[in-house]
A protein has these predicted regions:
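Non-catalytic accessory segments flanking enzymatic or RNA/DNA-binding domains
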Residues: 1-276
């Protein structure tokens, strides 16, 4: 086999080329296209080193997908409110890094519906679409609300999760394409059932803070998958440094081999070598 790249891995870059997603490994400063590798035998080799994506310190364990422990405990991007945006404490003056919070949290966010392993509600910065949907493996997606801050979008998501899921079932995601659904109809049903809660949030934060997104059609997304596995088996590079097999496809941040699946994003900051 020939080495085609090595370096600190981060989540694969993903872009739409028509309806189909094009992927590339990001190994340090180098990108290696992945779609052309489908059908080939590929080997990923963990080289035994992890370097924090923020400070570069070598660490035995990756925290919060790519950070050392000291950075995980002090960086705003590793705080609990990243996973639970409704717990944002920027307004309380206790943000770990107010400048970071201004840039990433106190900015427009989009609340969306996506169909990955089924319908889910999610939030992301307005600048992160459609990348967020591609990373999640969504086959359909529809933005439904534009919200002024991350915390406020978290309140909306919390309201909607009583009606729809807010998580993706990764095993179902990798077993096949989700059945198509009518996202506009689901949106309308959500707005109707949660009307009182939405009105309360608009009264609290202002009408301009939470606005519906109208006249937008759902996006349809296709993933480069030749064959889905009958049984889901995950590679674990911490236990076995080699993941090898015939690459059958890519979906979300997962590589699908005939021998197992691997979530590339999980191994952010790991030093890897890729062989073909």
């Amino acid at each position: 086999m020939i080495e085609i790249g090595r370096g600190a891995i981060s989540k694969m870059s993903a872009r739409l080329d028509g309806p189909t997603v094009q992927y590339a490994f990001r190994l340090g400063d180098v990108e290696v296209p992945v779609n052309p590798l489908i059908g080939s035998t590929i080997r990923l080799e963990y080289l035994g080193a992890i370097h924090c994506t923020h400070c570069g310190r070598r660490t035995k364990t990756s925290f919060s997908q790519g950070y050392c422990y000291p950075c995980m405990t002090k960086l705003a991007q590793c705080d609990l409110c990243i996973m639970s945006p409704e717990r944002c404490h920027f307004d309380a003056g206790t943000c770990r890094d107010p400048a970071w919070g201004e840039q990433f949290c106190m900015t427009d966010h989009v609340v969306y519906l996506a169909n990955s392993s089924g319908v889910k509600v999610g939030i992301t910065r307005a600048t992160q679409l459609p990348t967020r949907w591609l990373d999640q493996g969504a086959s359909q997606a529809l933005p439904i609300l534009r919200v002024a801050t991350r915390q406020q979008s978290g309140f909306v998501e919390d309201l909607f999760r009583s009606q729809v899921a807010d998580k993706t079932n990764w095993r179902a995601l990798l077993k096949g394409d989700a059945a198509a659904v009518d996202l506009p109809a689901i949106r309308d049903s959500l707005f109707e059932s949660c009307a009182q809660g939405l009105q309360g949030l608009q009264e609290r934060f202002g009408l301009q803070a939470i606005q519906t997104i109208a006249d937008v059609e759902p996006i349809e997304i296709r993933y480069p998958v030749q064959q889905y596995p009958a049984k889901i088996v995950s590679f674990n590079l911490d236990k076995d440094p080699i993941a090898e097999g015939t690459l059958l496809g890519i979906k979300g941040q997962y590589l699908i081999f005939d021998t197992g699946v691997i979530n590339i994003r999980k191994y952010t900051a790991y030093q890897l070598a890729v062989h073909q």
